[in-house]
């Protein structure tokens, strides 16, 4: 939809979509179509080459937050040194948001996690405190599974029977 002009801008934080997406030509064409691309990262990666604005990122050693991997495991990240750029990633995002007129007046990354937990049913029971106590949690983490859910869909899928989609085979050239 970026190519068609429906999306005008993109804010990409800590992800190299021009390199990591399976269809890089489609992604780079979409990036070229944007009126404004803002990239926040540690490195001038492939996506940054399309950026109109580049903001400095923080390493995992310089910020508080979480990482969630492909097995749904939410792991805590705790700052061990001050960010060399002066700010954690979430602080830069909040400052940009405030400057654009959408208030994000957080004082700590834990407040963001609390908001995510209040708005996302599968994260309802997640907090910095619980992550620090347990080490990591696999979502969903809620009233039914207060310490997370290591295995999903044991008896059935959440939405009933599994859904399969037929896709067209496209041979490589």
Where are these regions (language model features)?
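Non-catalytic alpha/beta scaffold blocks inside enzyme catalytic domains
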Residues: 1-127
């Amino acid at each position: 939809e970026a190519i068609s002009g429906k999306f005008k801008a993109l804010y990409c934080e800590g992800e190299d979509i021009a390199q990591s997406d399976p269809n890089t030509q489609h992604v780079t064409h979409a990036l070229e179509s944007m009126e404004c691309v803002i990239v926040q990262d540690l490195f001038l990666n492939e996506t940054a080459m399309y950026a109109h604005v580049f903001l400095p990122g923080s390493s995992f050693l310089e910020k508080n937050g979480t990482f969630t991997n492909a097995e749904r495991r939410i792991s805590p990240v705790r700052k061990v040194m001050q960010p060399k750029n002066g700010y954690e990633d979430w602080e830069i995002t909040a400052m940009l948001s405030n400057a654009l007129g959408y208030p994000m007046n957080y004082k700590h990354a834990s407040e963001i996690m609390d908001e995510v937990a209040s708005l996302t049913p599968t994260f309802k029971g997640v907090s910095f405190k619980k992550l620090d106590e347990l080490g990591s949690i696999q979502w969903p983490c809620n009233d039914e599974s207060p310490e997370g859910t290591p295995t999903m869909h044991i008896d059935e899928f959440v939405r009933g029977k599994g859904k399969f989609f037929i896709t067209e085979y496209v041979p490589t050239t």
